[in-house]
């Protein structure tokens, strides 16, 4: 099934992200958690290209295939290009086709310190265009409510986003954010710029102090005062912090659905408990 067709149903699309285990762990180590997460029956599950920079291309396809064939949920395979040649991309696309994976989230990927990027693909839009020329894949792209860290300003960022859509992305999934007003302003900028494809809001339930620090460092998401106060109050009580993080994410999602967003993409961090609590809280609203 092509993921883009979900946005024609009139309901709020609700999807998850999961990731493969590190190379040092057997791939089967995540199957139990992924089965629990899949049992919540999201509209689709996306599988990241790697886990903390140490994952495997083939593991992404293997897990995406497992989710689709064995757990009965449509899957989306992430694919990055900055450190890949066309031959690398061709191998991945062939693997996806062979295993019935129809949906790809096309990403540039992170620059690796000390590693010279390959020359075949400079931007995610280059990858979108290439995938579109290579077969009948449904292509998703990423977007950044608080502006991509390498963009000079909002204008350049939206220009790059529009280019990604023009290159073949049929829908978009946003980077995480904690302030819904930031997301609504982003949607308005995208609309004015003529970005008229469905956009899913990326929600990250923060469940530990270390996760907050890591996520802010990685993506530069701003922390609204309400969020910061919650985290400060419970930062020495792990279970309370987890539950407060879940509650904050639920509040975000309820507000987003009320504002008529196209979809919610939940970054589950492979945590069935968190995914279940949030799904139970919002499923009647979708």
Where in the sequence are the language-model features?
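Active-site mouth loops of central-metabolism enzymes
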Residues: 13-29, 75-87, 140-156, 233-247
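Glycine-rich, proline-tolerant flexible connector loops at the mouths of alpha/beta enzymes
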Residues: 21, 43-63, 110-119, 170-183, ...
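N-terminal amphipathic alpha-helix/helix-capping segment at the start of soluble metabolic enzymes
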Residues: 1-16, 23, 228, 283-286
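Glycine-rich anion/phosphate-binding loops
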Residues: 29, 81-95, 118-122
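Active-site pocket-lining/capping segments in soluble small-molecule metabolic enzymes
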Residues: 119, 123-144, 194-246, 251, ...
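Active-site beta-loop-alpha junctions enriched in small/polar residues
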Residues: 18-21, 48-52, 78-84, 109-111, ...
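Conserved, mostly hydrophobic/aromatic
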Residues: 17, 45, 96, 164, ...
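Glycine-rich, positively charged N-terminal anion/phosphate-binding segment
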Residues: 3-4, 27-36, 52-73
